[in-house]
C-alpha cells in the first residue's frame, strides 16, 4: 500500500522569493501522520510540501491513499489535488484546520474527512481501510493528543528546503478565546500537550543546538509550561517560539523560559486600541507592551510582533500611527495582516450575521485581502493601508534603528526587516493586480 501526504500551495505561501523561501520551516503534520501509520500493513509513505517543492504529479505514479491537509487559503488547491488524484483512482482523505471547521464542504471533495487531531483516528482509519470498511468521517478529540507516543518522520521531508532549525511541537490548542483565532475554534478552547519526556526525547534525537517551537500557546497551561521549561534547561539548546503578553506578569515562568534557552519570541500584539482588544476578547494590556518588550530585550530575546488591521474601532489615522507606536515599544521585527474572518470562527459568525462578509473565495483568506466590509473605510482602502503602513514601517531609517537598538542579533534583525520590506513589495504587486481586475 502507498500513501501520499500533501500540504497544498496557496496564493500567499512560502514558495515566493529567495527571502520567503529562506524562512520556510518544516511543517509537522505530514511527518506525524507518517509516524502514526501502523507498520504492520507494510505501507510506503511519501510527503510533498508544495510550499517548497514543484512537483509534476503525472510522473509520481499511483497511490492507494492521498491525504491532504489544508488551511483556508490553501483548501481550494487541496480540492484541485483531490479531484486530480480521485480521477486516477486514489482514495482521498482530507483534514486540517479548514476541513475541521467546514467538514460538510470538504466531504464533497474527499472520500473520508477527518476533524480535529489525528493521533487516534488516523490509525483507526488505516485499519478500517485495510479491512475495506473506511468511514466517511472520523472525529478526533483533544484528549487524543500525545497518546500515540511517536517521533515525527522528518526524513520524509526535504530538509535542505527549510531553515536550519528543526521544528518541534509540545503544546496544542489555546485556552484564550480571541474572536478571530482559528486555533481556538479548532481546539474548542482547550489545551492539549504531548508528554514532556516524549518531547525531550524528540529534541535529543534531532541533535540540533537550535529549535523552532510551533506551539500556538506554550504557556496556556502554566504547570505544564514550568515543567517543560525546566526539562529543557539541561539540553542547553537555543530556541524561538510563540508567546502571549501575559508572560510579563508571571516572573517564575518568565525566568524559566529564559533559562531554558529562549532567544526569540513571536508575540501577537494585534492592536494599540483597548476597545479593539475587548471587542476581540484579546487579553492584552496596551500599557504593558513596552515593558514586555523591554523585559525580553534585557534577557537577550528578540521580539517579532504581529499586528492586525481592520478592527471595527480602527480608523485611517489610528492605523497610520502604528509604525510610531511600534518603534516606541521597541519591537524588533513587525508584521502586519488584515483581520481575516476564517469560516466558523466567532468573528466570521458575527460578521456574517451583520451581512458584512464580502468574499467566500477561500483563496482570499490569506491575511492580505479584505474579505469583509470594515466599519470606517472600504475593503479596498483597508488593503491599501496594509501596503502603506508596511511601507512606512519598513523605511530604511526605521529598519536601521531596530537593528542597532539592542546588542542582540543586529545583523539578523537587519536582514529580516529588509527581507520583509522586499516581501511587502510583492504583496503590493499582488494586490495591485487584483485591484486592476476589479476596476
What are these language model-derived features?
Residues 150-304, 311, 316, 321-324:
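Radical SAM [4Fe-4S] cluster-binding motif and immediate context
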Residues 104-124, 256-266, 321-336:
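Structural recognition of alpha->loop->beta junctions
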Residues 2-5, 17, 42-44, 62, ...:
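Radical SAM enzyme core and accessory elements
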Residues 47-51, 69, 185, 217, ...:
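Residue-level recognition of beta-strand->loop/alpha-helix junctions
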Residues 10-14, 105, 223, 275, ...:
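Flexible glycine/acidic-rich beta-alpha junction loops that bind and position SAM and/or redox cofactors
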Residues 36-40, 84, 88, 105, ...:
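Alpha-helical structural signal in soluble globular domains
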Amino acid at each position: 500500500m502507498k500513501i501520499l501526504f500533501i500540504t497544498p500551495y496557496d496564493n500567499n505561501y512560502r514558495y515566493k522569493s529567495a527571502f520567503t523561501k529562506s524562512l520556510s520551516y518544516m511543517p509537522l503534520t505530514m511527518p506525524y501522520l507518517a509516524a502514526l501509520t501502523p507498520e504492520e500493513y507494510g505501507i510506503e509513505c511519501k510527503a510533498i510540501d508544495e510550499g517548497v517543492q514543484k512537483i509534476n504529479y503525472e510522473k509520481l505514479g499511483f497511490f492507494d491513499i492521498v491525504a491532504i491537509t489544508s488551511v483556508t487559503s490553501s483548501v481550494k488547491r487541496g480540492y484541485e489535488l483531490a479531484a486530480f488524484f480521485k480521477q486516477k483512482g486514489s482514495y482521498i482523505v482530507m483534514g486540517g484546520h479548514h476541513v475541521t471547521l467546514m467538514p460538510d464542504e470538504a466531504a464533497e471533495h474527499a472520500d473520508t474527512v477527518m476533524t480535529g487531531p489525528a493521533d487516534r483516528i488516523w490509525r483507526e482509519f488505516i485499519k478500517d481501510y485495510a479491512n475495506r470498511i473506511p468511514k466517511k468521517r472520523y472525529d478526533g478529540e483533544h484528549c487524543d493528543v500525545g497518546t500515540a507516543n511517536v517521533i515525527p518522520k522528518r526524513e520524509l521531508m526535504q530538509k535542505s528546503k527549510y531553515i536550519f532549525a528543526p521544528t518541534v511541537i509540545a503544546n496544542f490548542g489555546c485556552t484564550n478565546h480571541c474572536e478571530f483565532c482559528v486555533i481556538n475554534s479548532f481546539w474548542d478552547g482547550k489545551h492539549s500537550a504531548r508528554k514532556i519526556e516524549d518531547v525531550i526525547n524528540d529534541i535529543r534525537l534531532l541533535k540540533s543546538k537550535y529549535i523552532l517551537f510551533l506551539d500556538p500557546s506554550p504557556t496556556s497551561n502554566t504547570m505544564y509550561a514550568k515543567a517543560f521549561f525546566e526539562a529543557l534547561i539541561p539540553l542547553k539548546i537555543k530556541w524561538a517560539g510563540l508567546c502571549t503578553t501575559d508572560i510579563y506578569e508571571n516572573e517564575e515562568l518568565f525566568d524559566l523560559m529564559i533559562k531554558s534557552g529562549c532567544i526569540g519570541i513571536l508575540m501577537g500584539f494585534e492592536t494599540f486600541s483597548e476597545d479593539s482588544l475587548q471587542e476581540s476578547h484579546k487579553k492584552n494590556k496596551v500599557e504593558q507592551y513596552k515593558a514586555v518588550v523591554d523585559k525580553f530585550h534585557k534577557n537577550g530575546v528578540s521580539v517579532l510582533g504581529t499586528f492586525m488591521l481592520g478592527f471595527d474601532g480602527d480608523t485611517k489615522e489610528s492605523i497610520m500611527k502604528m509604525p510610531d507606536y511600534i518603534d516606541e515599544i521597541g519591537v524588533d521585527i513587525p508584521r502586519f495582516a488584515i483581520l481575516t474572518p476564517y469560516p466558523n470562527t466567532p468573528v466570521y459568525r458575527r460578521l456574517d450575521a451583520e451581512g458584512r462578509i464580502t468574499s467566500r473565495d477561500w483563496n482570499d483568506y490569506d491575511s492580505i485581502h479584505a474579505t469583509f466590509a470594515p466599519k470606517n473605510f472600504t475593503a479596498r482602502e483597508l488593503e491599501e493601508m496594509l501596503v502603506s503602513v508596511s511601507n512606512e514601517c519598513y523605511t530604511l531609517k526605521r529598519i536601521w534603528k531596530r537593528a542597532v537598538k539592542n546588542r542582540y542579533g543586529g545583523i539578523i534583525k537587519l536582514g529580516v526587516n529588509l527581507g520583509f520590506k522586499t516581501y511587502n513589495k510583492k504583496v503590493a504587486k499582488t494586490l495591485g493586480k487584483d485591484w486592476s481586475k476589479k476596476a
